[in-house]
From Swiss-Prot:
PROSITE patterns attached to this UniProt entry: ATP_GRASP
Family per similarity comment: Belongs to the prokaryotic GSH synthase family.
Gene3D superfamilies listed in its UniProt record: 3.40.50.20, ATP-grasp fold, A domain (3.30.1490.20), ATP-grasp fold, B domain (3.30.470.20)
Pfam families linked: GSH-S_ATP (PF02955), GSH-S_N (PF02951)
Metabolic or biological pathway: Sulfur metabolism; glutathione biosynthesis; glutathione from L-cysteine and L-glutamate: step 2/2
Annotated protein name in UniProt: Glutathione synthetase
Gene Ontology molecular functions: ATP binding; glutathione synthase activity; metal ion binding
Co-factor binding details: Binds 1 Mg(2+) or Mn(2+) ion per subunit.
Organism this protein belongs to: Wigglesworthia glossinidia brevipalpis
Binding residue positions for ATP: 149-206
Domain (ATP-grasp): residue spans on this chain: 123-309
UniProt-listed PANTHER family: GLUTATHIONE SYNTHETASE, RIBOSOMAL PROTEIN S6 MODIFICATION PROTEIN
Length: 316
């Protein structure tokens, strides 16, 4: 019987209709996995071992009571077969520390998804710059550099490097009178880096989320369409969605980075594509499977767990 630990934000506050971690837990429970619920703050390292104050949990699709804790355990994490790291950004100093702690468990043969070193090494926004599909990009905390970039490329998008869900993303047109205060806010008055990209007008047609499992793309993607007063293609920011088959360029981008993802132990990934550009490689806690499954009648959680079981067989 597979022992699966899932590190996530408090389960008491999730929306089960949308929550990818919950969907994975439901599928794992169907397969009779031992399911251990863990919050990041409850993990600790002591004298060569890594422990967690965890709960053996059961889940059900019930919007009033979707989980119950069966038993509390202080578990040595090397006893688990697989750990899913599903803590949402921001990628802060505590997140960084936990990647070092989890990396230690890999020495005991525990499969961790996604690989802690890669979570640490590959920022979701910056990692796209290694590929030819990235839009024109500036990373800076200098107001002068941002002004210069805007002079060259016109309308721009400014966003923080370590957040999610469209949080603090700004669309700045040329000669926008608010550009100075926006730059001050995002860069903390010139002390923090932010990411600036050329505005891609195809965002009006939607931001495409492509799910990659062990380097292979699902054939349908979640297209998040900004509402009339927005440029952010994030469901958390009020976007609507559609489910569409992958285009030729989507397959091209996916296949181009497939070997990179597999080599780095990035098993469960969400690519964000606007037009023909790769804008993010989501590796911390990719979402979107519930929306895709609502139209594309397949269990994405099942495909993920099938892949995990194959990886466990290879490891053991």
């Amino acid at each position: 019987m597979i022992k699966l630990g899932i590190i996530m934000d408090p389960i008491s506050s999730i929306k089960i209709k949308k929550d990818t971690s919950f969907s994975i837990m439901l599928e794992a429970q169907k397969r009779n996995y031992f399911l251990y619920y863990i919050e990041m703050k409850d993990i600790y390292y002591e004298v060569g071992e890594v422990y967690a104050n965890s709960y053996l949990i059961s889940v059900k699709y019930d919007e009033k009571k979707w989980y119950s804790f069966k038993k509390k355990y202080t578990i040595n994490l090397k006893e688990l077969d697989v750990i899913l790291m599903r803590k949402d950004p921001p990628f802060d100093i505590e997140f960084l520390y936990i990647t070092y702690i989890l990396e230690h468990i890999e020495n005991f043969g525990v499969l961790i998804i996604n690989k802690p070193k890669s979570l640490r090494d590959y920022n979701e926004k910056i990692s796209t710059l290694s590929f030819k599909y990235s839009p024109k990009t500036l990373i800076s905390c200098s107001k002068k550099a941002i002004y210069s970039f805007q002079e060259k490329f016109g309308d721009i998008i400014l966003k923080p490097i370590n957040k999610m869900g469209g949080d603090s993303v700004f669309y700045v047109k040329k000669n926008d009178p608010n550009v100075s205060v926006i730059i001050d806010q995002l860069t903390n008055y010139g002390n923090s880096f932010c990411l600036i990209q050329e505005y891609i007008k195809e965002i009006l047609n939607g931001d495409r989320r492509i799910i990659m499992i062990n380097g292979s793309p699902l054939p349908y993607c979640l297209v998040r369409i900004p509402n009339d007063k927005e440029i952010r293609g994030n469901l958390a920011a009020g976007a609507s969605f559609d489910i569409l088959p992958l285009r030729k360029i989507d397959y091209e981008i996916s296949n181009n980075i497939s070997s990179f993802l597999k080599d780095k132990g990035l098993i469960f990934v969400g690519l964000d594509i606007i037009g023909n550009y790769l804008t993010e490689i989501n590796i911390t806690s990719p979402t979107g499977i519930n929306e895709i499954e609502s139209v594309y009648k397949v269990s994405i959680s099942g495909i993920l767990l099938d892949s995990i079981e194959k990886l466990l067989n290879i490891k053991h």
